[in-house]
Amino acid sequence: MRSVKYILLVLLLLPAMQQVHADDIGLWAEAGFSKSISKKFSWGMEAGMRTGDDFGLISRIDIGASVSYKPVKFLKLTAGYALIFDHERMEINEHFNSRGKMNGYNINKSFWRPKNRLYFDVSGKLPIGRFSFTLRERYQYTRYPSVSYDREKYRGLVSDGYTGKQYGGYALDEETLEHKKLKQKHYLRSKLTAEYDIHHCPLTPFVSAEISNDFSDGFAVVKQRYTAGVDWKIKKKHVITLGYVYTNGHDDDVDGNIHAISVGYNFKF
């Protein structure tokens, strides 16, 4: 049990050690269930949410479903769909005139943007003693519909007696409705996971590393994600997952360095 306590201690300390270097730290929570249709087929559903800075405002909500097929014991094929709503934060940009002198601000108001995601997985699992290693290759397609949002333009320094709307000492000049065009993204996400089965213990520690390649950008690596955590089998069909996630890169889900605590629950029928 000492090794288990050490693993849990490390998981609790990791976010604190990394927080100084993070652009963002939040909570990723999800819950789902899965049900076997036969020995080879199963299906499931899940829902999740993510927060932004310091466990603050919700930045993402998602719900999805998937179907899996195991032609042989060590191989699994999965197809799934997810509906995701991303919260785009308010964006404040300085505005400069043709001579390079600042003359106001452009403020894009916050808004929610939906996206539809399809994915197809091929996963292979290799047990070695009490360790098991899983390699998952995922093709992921994401479609963003067009969306509109509000923009406020502030120009001209505020004079004494001004009672209108202002920001940073500049008066509101114009409010416009802006548009983001439809876009589509194609990625290959490769993930390697290692687990360790502790004898007569309900806790299974794991670590994973994942990279994302962008098909539309010469197959460039655009994101890396590293996870350390533990699965706690509280009952035969109930599993709680606690972990720490570090993500670095720029794709359709993240932008910059993100540190998060992940919490999950899964029920198997």
What are these regions (language model features)?
Residues M1-L27, F269:
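Bacterial Sec-dependent N-terminal signal peptides
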Residues E137-V239, V245-T247, F269:
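Outer-membrane beta-barrel transmembrane domain signature
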Residues A47-D53, Y81-H87, P114, L126-I128, ...:
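Transmembrane beta-strands of outer-membrane beta-barrel pores
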Residues K40-M45, F74-A79, G129-F133, H200-T204, ...:
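Repeated loop/turn-to-beta-strand initiation elements of outer-membrane beta-barrel proteins
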